[in-house]
Swiss-Prot record:
This is Isoprene synthase, chloroplastic. The keyword Ion transport does not apply. One of its GO terms (cellular component) is chloroplast. GO terms for molecular function: isoprene synthase activity; magnesium ion binding. Dimethylallyl diphosphate binds at D350, E428, R494, N497. The gene is ISPS. The Asp-Asp-Xaa-Xaa-Asp/Glu (DDXXD/E) motif is important for the catalytic activity, presumably through binding to Mg(2+). The lineage of its organism: Eukaryota, Viridiplantae, Streptophyta, Embryophyta, Tracheophyta. Mg(2+) 3 binds at N497, T501, E505. Mg(2+) 1 binds at D350, D354. Belongs to the terpene synthase family. Tpsb subfamily. One of its GO terms (biological process) is diterpenoid biosynthetic process. Residues 1-45 form a transit peptide.
């Protein structure tokens, strides 16, 4: 099978030549130095960039035939939410205090409190009540030591999941009591849909080697599917189907909150306050996100790369959606802006390496990034000059903003992430150009870097660390040496991408992705078998991340760990039904509308 796939790859490796574009020669570059009047790192502008026009090049170049941008500048600038924000903020503040009192009530039964915390979390309000939730969970742990009422599968599984999600060390052995004499899970649980669903969700918080949780997952999936076949309540069936498609732990939580807002039914009358707060908060945070998106669309349009280079993806909206997925909470605006800018450039430069550039040109560009010297532009072809200057200016500006706001000297870490990224891009280009299929382990080692994850996580780390003393050597080593939580998140990013994009890459003549490498190395393996092995690898990386999040030796800031985990989640989301970045489909468009365009329907007259 691998041989046949390689033959197919060779047939497709020389696509029909398509016209492409280049730019007329321009030598008018101006360098801005750091000074009291201009206190930024070296920044270079192109004095005549507005004079560049697209012209057809006679030399043949490949094209990925990306679909046009769905969201133009005028549309993004027209986004306007008519919320009466001041009035809504007043109401939200009052509701927030009432919900806080609900969480902190000492007479609430443990299960009711756990369900309330789960609702708060699923409705996207964790960031408002983080300290209250931790305190409540600590009290539940203490209570649990004295009251061994653990016969309820739903209560046990929900407690286990929430505790692990929030960094508590809790043993998988809490599920031993639900086993029968033969060592399997008791048959009496087969009809407990609520308990099975909670057990299923809890099983995705497992660590490597926790076989009991693997058994729990298999058992719960089997009997949840059986219950669906036999027929259960329509609303419950919808929840079960939704969970079986992708567990909550791996879902994009901001998007999940929007889904849950439509489904939530308060368990008690006073929980209506929680729903009301969640609706208001969703819309107010959406307004903030829209304003950020408009600012970034002006930056993107002014930079002009997507309009000048017709072979690249013009995907600002999708890139901002990714940044929002990594850092959704309102206080992380600077992080979202930095990630959007870095990822926007990643998509452009990735297309230069994957689609357009010759090997000689790509080597020159890689050398220029390695030097990080503006004079290196003299060695580059015109289209690469714009790419390099855009990268040089944006990274320097991002570094300057972080230095100004947080006092972190971070430029060397940001530039290192780009040096490593471009070298990984170049390696893939060499493999593809020479029709080499690397060993799977060698491919994955390089591909986890070429995922671009570190280029996104590096500015994220410095953006969320509030003070210079928050910077730890351990965290910096994770970024520079590429290990632990950072590596796992990047591997998941890459494998999710490969599962979705391998067919299109094969059509372009590329032979370097994980599916092809795995099939080539394991002769006789079918494509579906290779895909299943990649899914197992993704699951293994999730278990590593789960372990590190509760490890006493972890010195990474909690906010950064959540952002790294969120990068894995947004990878699942973006590539769940296909290539949501390269070829956005209806699902991608609908998700963007839910989070960034359409507010949740509320009656504002209630708050006037």
């Amino acid at each position: 099978m691998a041989t046949n796939l390689l033959c197919l790859s060779n047939k497709l490796s020389s696509p029909t030549p398509t016209p492409s574009t280049r730019f007329p020669q321009s030598k008018n570059f101006i360098t801005q130095k750091t000074s009291l009047a201009n206190p930024k790192p070296w920044r270079v502008i192109c004095a005549t960039s507005s004079q560049f026009t697209q012209i057809t090049e006679h030399n043949s170049r490949r094209s990925a035939n990306y679909q046009p941008n769905l969201w133009n500048f005028e549309f993004l600038q027209s986004l306007e939410n008519d919320l009466k924000v001041e009035k809504l903020e007043e109401k939200a503040t009052k509701l927030e205090e009432e919900v806080r009192c609900m969480i902190n009530r000492v007479d609430t039964q443990p299960l009711s409190l756990l369900e309330l915390i789960d609702d708060v979390q699923r409705l996207g309000l964790t960031y408002k009540f983080e300290k209250d939730i931790i305190k409540a969970l600590e009290n539940i742990v203490l209570l649990d030591e004295n009251k061994k009422n653990k016969s309820d599968l739903h209560a046990t599984a929900l407690s286990f999941r929430l505790l692990r999600q929030h960094g508590f060390e809790v043993s998988q052995d809490v599920f031993e009591r639900f086993k029968d004499k033969e060592g399997g899970f008791s048959g009496e649980l087969k009809g407990d849909v609520q308990g099975l669903l909670s057990l299923y969700e809890a099983s995705y918080l497992g660590f490597e080697g926790e076989n009991l949780l693997e058994e729990a997952r298999t058992f719960s999936i089997t009997h949840l599917k059986n219950n669906l076949k036999e027929g259960i309540n329509t609303k419950v069936a919808e929840q079960v189907s939704h969970a079986l498609e992708l567990p909550y732990h791996q879902r994009l939580h901001r998007l999940e909150a929007r889904w849950f807002l439509d489904k939530y039914e308060p368990k008690e009358p006073h929980h209506q306050l929680l729903l009301e707060l969640a609706k208001l908060d969703f819309n107010m945070v959406q307004t903030l996100h829209q304003k950020e998106l408009q600012d970034l669309s002006r930056w993107w349009t002014e930079m002009g790369l997507a309009s000048k280079l017709d072979f690249v993806r013009d995907r600002l909206m999708e890139v901002y959606f990714w940044a929002l997925g990594m850092a959704p909470d309102p206080q992380f605006g600077e992080c979202r802006k930095a990630v959007t800018k870095m990822f926007g450039l990643v998509t452009i430069i990735d297309d230069v390496y994957d689609v357009y550039g010759t090997l000689d040109e790509l080597q020159l560009f890689t050398d220029a990034v390695e030097r990080w010297d503006v004079n290196a532009i003299n060695t580059l072809p015109d289209y690469m000059k714009l790419c390099f200057l855009a990268l040089y200016n944006t990274v320097n500006d991002t570094s300057y903003s972080i230095l100004k706001e947080k006092g972190h000297n971070n430029l060397s870490y940001l530039t290192k992430s780009w040096r490593e990224l471009c070298k990984a891009f170049l390696q893939e280009a060499k493999w593809s150009n020479n029709k080499i299929i690397p060993a799977f382990s060698k491919y994955l080692e390089n591909a986890s870097v070429s995922s671009s994850g570190v280029a996104l996580l590096a500015p994220s780390y410095f953006s969320v660390c509030q003070q210079q003393e928050d910077i730890s050597d351990h965290a910096l080593r994770s970024l520079t040496d590429f290990h632990g939580l950072v590596r796992s998140s990047c591997v998941i990013f890459r494998l999710c991408n490969d599962l979705a994009t391998s067919a299109a890459e094969l059509e372009r003549g590329e032979t370097t992705n994980s599916i092809i490498s795995y099939m080539h190395e394991n002769d006789g393996t079918s494509e579906e078998q290779a895909r299943e092995e990649l899914r197992k690898l993704i699951d293994a990386e999730w278990k590593k991340m789960n372990r590190e999040r509760v490890s006493d030796s972890t010195l990474l800031p909690k906010a950064f760990m959540e952002i790294a985990v969120n990068m894995a989640r947004v990878s699942h989301c973006t590539y769940q039904y296909g290539d949501g970045l390269g070829r956005p489909d209806y699902a991608t468009e609908n998700r963007i509308k839910l989070l960034l365009i359409d507010p949740f329907p509320i009656n504002q007259l209630m708050y006037v």
